[in-house]
């Protein structure tokens, strides 16, 4: 490992014992050493050894480190130490530290690691325990507590959109008076807009932006700008990411004061800088589209030991929705597939993520780039990228879900033979080199992520490695299995059509457009790879002269039914109505050979007035349903609960009024200029 830092004096190379936790200056508290020991971390990682002393010594830091290098503890420990070394406790409803992450999953992960630390700090653990027991009602004068109210303690609060309402978050904030907030940008901004939440110069200490480059991405800039306007300029700020260098022009504008820039990288066998952990082997596999799923089956089945947790990356949410039905019929029964993407409701995302993290059997997560950044999923052995990422920056983050914290891992990216092979050289230029995925033999399990065969540059027995062999018969058999499954339920056919179209749109928007070209695609090969019964109607196929039915014949589209009875009933009613309409207008019914029945007129093809009336009626029904649910909940409440609701509503109304007045008032204070 090599560490580089700016604006600090050069130091001699650190020996291995200097990465001991008790060798830090200033020293860590005894309870933190106990917590770290209980977590099983015997030594600091290079990023922790470089960052913790500087962040604790009143320095702003910009940290670029390979994924899985321990960045979370590198900022949590300094934050906790700073707050617990204050001269006096932070005032009620005043905030001492804010930790911002781009996703709910990553924010939850940071919060859980923080709770694990605080479990070893007596006053903080006691306060959190009392908060749980009393449902948020904390009595600081409780004589049963062994710690006086003046004792310094950490009280965190997790703020996530979609899981709680802003009203519930504000209510919890007022009851618990947390001094550390872990949040996503949008929900944090809503809380900071309240006049009851204070980030004064006397109390606010630290701001941390995790996955900083993504936080500064489109969609987060405006929220960050407003958040920074509400924070004092005299603060410590830390930015942590695996690829800070690509967003440094924007990061400089965030408001850091003379930051120390820390870059922790990996030295490869040829002493070249790499941006990936040495314990992670990154490989590629050149394979035609029809061979991808057989290759997935081969890899997960032959690796030894069998990967307990694997991640399959797709380019779109629709592809995940489709393949969650397809893969169980392709893979061995011992593997469980779990879908996760950004369009799932928050409760489903959290449920599936927890299910995957806590799985005790071999599990495969089917996901998009929503699970590519920051998530520390324990013991991920294998990452397979079915689709190369649209944004090349995501490649590194996808691979980094495996090989974390020194654990060995394997990453494989699938590329089509031909022009896509140029992506290999493209990755080398970006200091993320990949080697060809190979098997030890055709009869023995691959040992590619075992210690004896791990190094791609110097394998123990290089002559025993061979490219994996997927036959045409394997590909044909897989396509037939998929089509047999699709024919059982028209809903899966619909998902296949949507997924294929969304995949094509994603492919056409690839930033490396000279490598990933729609004009080079083999449509019939792709259709068979996806198990389609026919190619969807798309502008890209306007000049296509091949077989749109992909060799599939004998499908009775009129009687091709949905498994869901209600949905099938609705389809048949639509079909009958359309048939009668065609008979009345044209004297003849539309035959089934014309293709699938068209959907009823959309909002774009009906009169504007009817469309507006339809939307208004939906809104009225939704509002009536909301009021009905509210009255049902109100009837079940006790008088005490009703009183709390009234108080909360009064507070929210007061907040709204104050915010409106604040927006209407023209201030002459210096404004944050934002990101160019």
Swiss-Prot record:
Coiled coil (UniProt feature): 610-664
InterPro entries: CTT_SPB4, DEAD/DEAH_box_helicase_dom, Helicase_ATP-bd, Helicase_C-like, P-loop_NTPase, RNA-helicase_DEAD-box_CS, RNA_helicase_DEAD_Q_motif, SPB4-like_CTE
MF-aspect GO terms: ATP binding; ATP hydrolysis activity; RNA binding; RNA helicase activity
Reactions that this protein is recorded to catalyse: ATP + H2O = ADP + phosphate + H(+)
Region (Disordered): 1-21, 129-150, 438-465, 566-645
SUPFAM superfamilies, per the entry: P-loop containing nucleoside triphosphate hydrolases
UniProt-listed Pfam families: CTE_SPB4, CTT_SPB4, DEAD, Helicase_C
EC number(s) given by UniProt: 3.6.4.13
Chief place where the protein resides: nucleus
GO process terms (BP): rRNA processing
Domain notes: The Q motif is unique to and characteristic of the DEAD box family of RNA helicases and controls ATP binding and hydrolysis.
The protein's name in its UniProt record: ATP-dependent rRNA helicase SPB4
Taxonomic placement: Eukaryota, Fungi, Dikarya, Ascomycota, Pezizomycotina
């Amino acid at each position: 490992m090599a560490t580089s830092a700016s604006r600090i004096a050069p130091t001699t190379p650190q020996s291995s014992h200097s990465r001991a936790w008790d060798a830090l200056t200033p020293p860590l508290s005894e309870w933190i050493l106990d917590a770290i020991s209980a977590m099983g971390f015997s030594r600091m990682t290079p990023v922790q050894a470089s960052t913790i002393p500087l962040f604790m010594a009143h320095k702003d830091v910009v940290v670029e480190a390979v994924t899985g290098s321990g960045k979370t503890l590198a900022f949590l420990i300094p934050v906790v130490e700073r707050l617990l070394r204050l001269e006096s406790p932070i005032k009620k409803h005043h905030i001492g530290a804010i930790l911002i992450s781009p996703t709910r999953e990553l924010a939850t992960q940071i919060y859980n690691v923080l709770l694990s630390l605080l479990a070893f700090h007596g006053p903080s653990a006691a306060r959190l325990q009392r908060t749980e027991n009393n449902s948020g009602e904390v009595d600081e004068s409780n004589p049963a507590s062994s710690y006086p109210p003046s004792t310094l303690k950490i009280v965190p609060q997790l703020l996530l959109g979609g899981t709680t309402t802003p009203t519930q978050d504000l209510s919890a904030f007022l009851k618990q008076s947390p001094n550390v907030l872990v949040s996503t940008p949008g929900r944090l901004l809503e809380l900071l807009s309240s006049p009851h939440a204070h980030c004064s110069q006397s109390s606010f200490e630290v701001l941390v932006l995790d996955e900083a480059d993504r936080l500064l991405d489109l969609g987060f800039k405006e929220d960050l700008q407003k958040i920074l306007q509400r924070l004092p300029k005299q603060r410590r700020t830390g930015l942590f990411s695996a690829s800070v260098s690509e967003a440094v022009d924007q990061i400089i504008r965030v408001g850091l004061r003379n930051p120390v820039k820390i870059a922790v990288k990996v030295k490869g066998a040829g002493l070249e800088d790499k941006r990936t952990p040495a314990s992670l082997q990154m490989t590629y596999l050149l394979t035609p589209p029809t061979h991808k799923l057989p290759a997935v089956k081969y890899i997960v089945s032959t690796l030894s030991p069998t990967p307990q947790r694997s991640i399959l990356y797709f380019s779109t949410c629709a592809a995940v929705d489709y393949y969650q039905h397809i893969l169980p019929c392709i893979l061995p029964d011992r593997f469980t597939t779990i879908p996760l993407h950004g369009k799932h409701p928050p409760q489903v995302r959290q449920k599936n993520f927890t299910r995957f993290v806590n799985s005790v059997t071999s599990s495969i997560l089917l996901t998009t780039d929503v699970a590519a950044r920051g998530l520390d999923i324990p013991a991920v052995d294998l990452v397979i990228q079915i689709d190369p990422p649209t944004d090349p920056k995501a490649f590194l983050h996808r691979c980094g879900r495996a090989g974390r914290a020194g654990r060995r891992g394997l990453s494989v990216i699938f590329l089509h033979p031909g022009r896509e092979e140029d992506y290999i050289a493209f990755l080398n230029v970006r200091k993320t080199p990949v080697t060809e995925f190979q098997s030890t033999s055709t009869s023995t399990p691959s040992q590619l992520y075992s210690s004896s065969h791990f190094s791609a540059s110097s394998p123990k027995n290089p002559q025993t490695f061979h490219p994996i062999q997927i036959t045409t018969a394997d590909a044909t058999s897989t396509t037939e299995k998929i089509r047999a499954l699709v024919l059982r339920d028209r809903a899966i056919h619909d998902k296949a059509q949507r997924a294929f179209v969304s995949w094509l749109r994603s492919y056409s928007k690839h930033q490396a457009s000279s490598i990933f070209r729609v004009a080079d695609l083999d449509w019939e090969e792709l259709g068979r790879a996806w198990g389609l019964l026919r190619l969807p109607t798309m502008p890209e196929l306007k000049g296509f002269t091949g077989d749109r039915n992909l060799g599939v014949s004998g499908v009775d589209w009129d009687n091709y039914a949905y498994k869901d009875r209600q949905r099938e009933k609705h389809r048949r009613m639509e079909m009958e109505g359309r048939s009668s309409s065609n008979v009345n207008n044209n004297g003849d019914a539309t035959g089934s050979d014309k293709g699938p029945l068209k959907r009823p007129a959309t909002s774009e093809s009906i009169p504007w007035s009817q469309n507006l009336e339809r939307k208004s009626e939906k809104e009225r029904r939704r509002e009536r349903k909301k009021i009905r649910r509210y009255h049902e909940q109100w009837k079940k409440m006790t008088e005490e609960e009703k009183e709390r609701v009234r108080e909360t509503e009064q507070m929210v109304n007061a907040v709204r009024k104050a915010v409106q007045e604040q927006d209407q008032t023209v201030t002459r204070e210096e404004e944050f200029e934002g990101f160019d």
